[in-house]
Amino acid sequence: MLTLLVLVFTVGLLLYVKLRWHYSYWSRRGVAGERPVYFRGNMSGLGRDLHWTDINLRIYRKFRGVERYCGYFTFMTKSLFIMDLELIRDIMIRDFSSFADRGLFHNVRDDPLTGNLLFLDGPEWRWLRQNLTQVFTSGKMKFMFPNMVEVGEKLTQACRLQVGEIEAKDLCARFTTDVIGSCAFGLECNSLQDPESQFRRMGRSVTQEPLHSVLVQAFMFAQPELARKLRFRLFRPEVSEFFLDTVRQTLDYRRRENIHRNDLIQLLMELGEEGVKDALSFEQIAAQALVFFLAGFDTSSTTMSFCLYELALNPDVQERLRVEVLAVLKRNNQKLTYDSVQEMPYLDQVVAETLRKYPILPHLLRRSTKEYQIPNSNLILEPGSKIIIPVHSIHHDPELYPDPEKFDPSRFEPEEIKARHPFAYLPFGEGPRNCIGERFGKLQVKVGLVYLLRDFKFSRSEKTQIPLKFSSRNFLISTQEGVHLRMEGLERP
């Protein structure tokens, strides 16, 4: 019995010493930071009462005025939390070669759809990035634009059948699902007519019914190598099977009928043809199609719904934007064209301010690929060190954006932008690992808003949540209770 007690005590003591040494990593290097809790690090409350933005803001506000960076622990995983904008510029652009990786979870063996541009690193990411960039040129956007307009008309038709109390996130998600289905897959998803269409159900399953809790997701992305060894999956099997079958049927149909379209699937087909160097496998093609679909429909619909929310709470902004939209449409014979969208500067400001207040990602992740000395310091990062860039916290810094909770599109007038540090605004990231679909995402948001503001007026309802509370179950910034508004029809000019 005594031997057992001694053994338990010894093991406990060794564990304590090891944990204490591990969690003193940053303090031993002279880096300030919140005192971590054993096993939880700085994550206490995450997924229960707190969202990632709450934790990041707490740390940012505590250290921003006195430190350029601080130590940060996601459970057991150590990261450097960067607050200095010049240092962020160094990491994302000047010294990009030292921080080219994101270090995100992927498990191609058990979950092949995780082998996509968003999650991959190294040569695989570089090859995909170089080849997929051509999908998002301005020329390609002009080619896809008529598809967006067609879905925009269907959006207003669907809205006329449900004036009154609406849940804006679902409405916007049905719109963006149909846009992505048309522009990426050449398919009619019909989510606006049928909210329970298969594409809509699968998209909702990924975003609203994730396979794992936010705590498990945090573990997977904090310890991707361990999660991969434990054979974790990110997507539900039925979601993977649906997208694999959809892509397989689309490819087979186009090859059989010799159909050629200027869209994402066509480019992926060409990158998978025999004779192409490092040609994509079928699973790799499906993985890129999936991430484009998920990123395109969910992030854009979230931005659209947040924008409608702010317009409902700020009727003066809504009316000024509607006046601009109607004036541009009148000049163009009531037709919306790719060029006419560029004639709406206030629309651009409104969307930019929405992304400032509600960036989709609470923070950006980078991982060092080599030893790196932080400029103007003695701190040397080891290869594999993780970096956190707190986008949401930066966007809510009152020194950068006075009264940050106020929705104020004038922050994005040209002279205001010029007066700010260029890295004070990071909704799409920066540098070679910025969001490849930025142009497409903003364009479909603007098209949707133009059609909605042309025909409808939005205001708060009894169910409107003020202020909005973010869902603690999701890493992305999304609402807990939805975006409930009142929608009234307007007479067309």
From Swiss-Prot:
Chief location category: endoplasmic reticulum
UniProt binding sites for heme: 435
Key words of the record: Endoplasmic reticulum, Heme, Iron, Membrane, Metal-binding, Microsome, Monooxygenase, Oxidoreductase
Pfam families: p450 (PF00067)
GO BP annotations, alphabetical order: defense response to bacterium
InterPro entries: Cyt_P450 (IPR001128), Cyt_P450_CS (IPR017972), Cyt_P450_E_grp-I (IPR002401), Cyt_P450_sf (IPR036396), Insect_CytP450_Detox (IPR050476)
Cofactor: heme
Record's subcellular location: Endoplasmic reticulum membrane; Microsome membrane
Superkingdom of this protein's organism: Eukaryota
Entry EC no(s): 1.14.-.-
A molecular function GO annotation: oxidoreductase activity, acting on paired donors, with incorporation or reduction of molecular oxygen
PROSITE patterns according to UniProt: CYTOCHROME_P450 (PS00086)
Membrane disposition: Peripheral membrane protein
UniProt xrefs under CDD domains: CYP6-like
Keyword Metal-binding: yes
Any single Gene Ontology cellular-component annotation: endoplasmic reticulum membrane
Function: May be involved in the metabolism of insect hormones and in the breakdown of synthetic insecticides.
Descriptive protein name: Probable cytochrome P450 6a13
Species, as recorded: Drosophila melanogaster
